[in-house]
Amino acid sequence: MSKRDYYQVLGVPRTASEDDLKKAYRRCAMKYHPDRNPGDAAAEAAFKECKEAYEVLADTKKRKLYDTHGHAAFEHGVGGGNAPDMNDIFGDIFGNIFGGARASRRGADVGYMVELDLEEAVAGVERQIQIPTLVECTHCNGSGSEDGHVETCGTCRGSGQVRIQRGIFAMQQTCPHCGGRGVIIRNPCKVCNGAGRVEDHKTLSVKIPAGVDNGDRIRLSGEGEQGPDGVPPGDLYVEVRVREHPIFQRDGDDLHCEVPVRISQAALGDIVRVATLDGEAEIRIPAETQSGKLFRLRGKGVRSVRSRTEGDLYCRIVVETPVNLTAEQRKLLEQFEMTFAGEDARKHSPKSATFLDGVKSFWDRMTS
């Protein structure tokens, strides 16, 4: 399940200040705190989500990483390669016990965040991106040696690992003499300082499929950092972030929008034109339509990136109160309002009548 954007979780814009973040987190925590919602698993999950979002965005360094790389910045192996590889750790300890060879290493995975408009996410798009990465040093051809000469480590005999006997257990660990490289470099390369890799930028063309949503990731195999000593490079993970749209809100493969109509249109009925992502469509509003009524346009949502089925567009009617009335319009409305006097009001406005009856009943009980 894709993680929600941290800014959306807290309900703040990407330009939010520290104070804005703190206030948003307090609101969220008060709303979803387990003590206020005992036994509510959904509230508990929402509380944890808010806490996780605030912990990242309230930390300047973490926020900068998140703004650049998205959720991938905090997942194992993505965005720098400083986290230890658990496969290597367990391979070092248990490799000889179970007879397994040292696991093949590779370069670190890299995370990159790409922002899309809703239209781009729905239709798919190809983007050129430039990413910082580590590539093989061309000066020493990745050897790390200025003169190209390297010596086989005498401690591990080139394997990069040493065998340690502890009681009945035979363990394998990274060679402390060569740091696991298996070689000793006496004359380090002046360009890469013996690392065999240098920092660089590379430009890639990324095809983003139609239907992607916030948090979706695209994996580009072998486009991550170059591994040390010629081992294969890692992968590049491109995480999608979709900008808010002025008209549509997305919910999975469905889209939602509000359609404002005049009082006369809602009362008498009308045909209203609405925007969709592929043009315009018409909604036939029946007479006496109330504000909040939903109309569904089948197949006018988003084509799923996974199942290739299409979602729907839900249009919510909002009856708009007229403003900036002329004297004539005001007079006509006053005359119209007078027609609701007496018992006719209950017939024409049943919800208002029911509400007033409820208020009267409440006060009668309070005063009795």
UniProtKB/Swiss-Prot annotation:
Localization (cell)? Cytoplasm
Question: Record's GO cellular component, any one?
Answer: cytoplasm
Q: Which domain of life is it from?
A: Bacteria
- Name the residues that bind Zn(2+) 2: 153, 156, 175, 178
Domain J: from-to ranges: 5-70
**Which Gene Ontology BP annotations are present?**
chaperone cofactor-dependent protein refolding; DNA replication; protein refolding; response to heat
* Keywords, alphabetical: Chaperone, Cytoplasm, DNA replication, Metal-binding, Repeat, Stress response, Zinc, Zinc-finger
> What coarse category fits the chief subcellular location reported for this protein?
cytoplasm
What does UniProt say about this protein's domains? The J domain is necessary and sufficient to stimulate DnaK ATPase activity. Zinc center 1 plays an important role in the autonomous, DnaK-independent chaperone activity of DnaJ. Zinc center 2 is essential for interaction with DnaK and for DnaJ activity.
HAMAP family from the UniProt entry: DnaJ (MF_01152)
Quaternary data: Homodimer.
Functional description taken from the UniProt entry: Participates actively in the response to hyperosmotic and heat shock by preventing the aggregation of stress-denatured proteins and by disaggregating proteins, also in an autonomous, DnaK-independent fashion. Unfolded proteins bind initially to DnaJ; upon interaction with the DnaJ-bound protein, DnaK hydrolyzes its bound ATP, resulting in the formation of a stable complex. GrpE releases ADP from DnaK; ATP binding to DnaK triggers the release of the substrate protein, thus completing the reaction cycle.
Write the protein's name.
Answer: Chaperone protein DnaJ
Which organism was this protein described from? Answer: Xylella fastidiosa (strain M12)
